[in-house]
């Protein structure tokens, strides 16, 4: 069932798991072909978690876009309010026509 390992002579035959574990190479001892790294086949795992700024930058970008849109809407609303105020000041006023046309007709 077990193949004979080079370290089998050091351990008794009653404990085969010892030499099987001892014969397994560690990750740092394995040879990695540089061509494999470029093709993505044998990529070593990272020991620390990776940090990415893509998500926080996207959140900030969206908030900036929303803030710019809100500012433009506020300015447009203010311009419309001024235009409405001017319109309402002139509605129903007869003073504007008083200087240009006579108020009485002489027949």
Swiss-Prot record:
Identify the Pfam families for this entry. CRF
Cellular component annotations (GO), alphabetically ordered = extracellular region
Tissue specificity statement from the Swiss-Prot or TrEMBL entry: Expressed in corpora cardiaca (CC), corpora allata (CA), antennal lobe (AL) and gnathal ganglion (GNG) (at protein level). Expression in AL and GNG detected in some animals, in CC and CA in few animals (at protein level).
* Major place of residence: secreted
Question: Which residues are reported to carry the modification Valine amide?
Answer: 91
Point out the propeptide residues: 1-44
Supply the name of the protein. Answer: Diuretic hormone 45
């Amino acid at each position: 069932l077990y193949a004979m390992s080079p370290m089998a002579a050091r351990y008794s035959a009653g404990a085969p798991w010892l030499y099987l574990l001892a014969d397994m190479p560690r990750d740092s001892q394995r040879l990695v072909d540089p061509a494999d790294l470029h093709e993505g086949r044998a990529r070593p795992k990272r020991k620390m978690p990776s940090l990415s700024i893509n998500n926080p930058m996207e959140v900030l970008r969206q908030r900036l876009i929303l803030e710019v849109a809100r500012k433009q809407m506020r300015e447009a609303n203010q311009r419309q309010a001024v235009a409405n105020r001017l319109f309402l000041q002139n509605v129903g006023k007869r003073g504007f026509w008083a200087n240009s046309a006579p108020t009485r007709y002489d027949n």
